[in-house]
């Protein structure tokens, strides 16, 4: 799997420029004009992981296959979008399909780039985006809750349970709070996720700053960081211009460019890390002569379900997992050395896969 991240924001905040850079494509027509992105553009990137390169070298793998991250560039929101202003509800549904939402906020001053509300205020921009998503959630949830409540009153047990779940985000949305604030029990979570509420998604605030502020941020991004800390959201500081230049460079020129900009790594890496932390994702590996491959799972996933990410047959016929920790695999110079050192473990169906595990699944056909 990997994960799917929706990129949202007001028009002209650098959203499509950032999308182009992150996915190294020119799929989104980045122009100084609101609503130039009408259909969501979808781009995939390989998730950088130095461990995978090391494993491929040690395991003498012919091919390296990273896990994938999907970005969905969703058309520019404006105030009133939930009521059909701007592009309206046509694109809001695209956010329902993503795992996390990146709010791109304009944290730079440039008189040549218009702002849809003629001001530079990233917190106000975030409020506009969040409000429109909350209003869309409230409208859809009230319609569904009304129908479910009627069924619940007839004594339908399933309807009663579902209505109890619906009530929690409904009350919050009526108070102007996002659905992600709802306190759900583990038993309620599947039903809550199935509601696919826009504001139930974890949020990453992406502060698009001027080039000179890419390393340390600026006064605007500091405001966003304070809000994110209070909300438990993530923040990534990025200069879309720098990312755009970086994406067009030859591989051998990239390190020098980053050093010149005072950066240790590209913004993509920081955004991926923020997303993984928000969604509580971990990576395990499979290594062989043919390929070294990374697989993304949710923290806490057990071995059979982790195997199922490769193929459903692996999960159905799961017998055991031959498991070596990443450090032990490298220290042993591969599977044979790790096994000789007593570092290979045979794990059963209750084993919780750890980040960095190198695994070989045994299964019955």
Predicted segments — roles?
Residues 22, 84-87, 116-119, 218-222, ...:
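Short, glycine/charged-enriched secondary-structure capping and boundary segments
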């Amino acid at each position: 799997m990997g994960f799917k991240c929706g990129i949202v924001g007001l028009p002209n905040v650098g959203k499509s420029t950032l999308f182009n850079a992150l996915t190294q494509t020119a799929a989104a027509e980045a122009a100084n004009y609101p609503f130039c992105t009408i259909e969501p553009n979808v781009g995939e990137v390989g998730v950088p992981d130095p461990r995978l390169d090391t494993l491929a070298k040690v395991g003498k793998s012919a091919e390296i296959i990273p896990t994938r991250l999907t970005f969905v560039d969703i058309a520019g929101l404006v105030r009133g979008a939930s009521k059909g202003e701007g592009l309206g509800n046509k694109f809001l549904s695209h956010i329902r399909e993503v795992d996390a939402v990146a709010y791109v906020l304009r944290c730079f001053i440039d008189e040549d780039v218009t702002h849809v509300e003629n001001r530079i205020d990233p917190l106000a921009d975030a409020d506009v985006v969040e409000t429109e998503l909350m209003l869309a959630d409230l409208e859809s949830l009230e319609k569904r809750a009304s129908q479910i409540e009627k069924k619940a009153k007839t004594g339908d047990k399933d309807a009663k349970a579902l209505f109890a779940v619906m009530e929690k985000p409904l009350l919050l949305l009526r108070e102007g709070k996002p659905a992600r604030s709802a306190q759900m029990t583990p038993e309620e979570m599947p039903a809550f996720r199935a509601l696919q509420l826009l504001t139930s998604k974890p949020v990453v605030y992406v502060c698009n700053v001027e080039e000179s502020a890419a390393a340390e941020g600026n006064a605007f991004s500091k405001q966003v960081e304070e809000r994110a800390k209070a909300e438990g959201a993530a923040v990534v500081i990025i200069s879309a211009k720098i990312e755009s230049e970086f994406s067009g460079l030859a591989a051998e020129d990239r390190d020098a460019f980053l050093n010149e900009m005072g950066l240790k790594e590209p913004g993509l890496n920081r955004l991926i890390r923020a997303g993984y932390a928000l969604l509580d994702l971990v990576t395990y590996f499979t290594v062989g002569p043919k390929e070294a491959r990374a697989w993304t799972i949710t923290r806490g996933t057990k071995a059979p379900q982790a195997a199922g990410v490769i193929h459903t047959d692996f999960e159905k016929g799961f017998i055991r997992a031959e498991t070596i920790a990443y450090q032990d695999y490298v220290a042993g110079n591969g599977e044979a050395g790790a096994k000789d050192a007593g570092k290979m473990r045979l794990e059963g169906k209750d084993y919780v896969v750890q980040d960095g595990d190198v695994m070989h699944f045994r299964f019955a056909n």
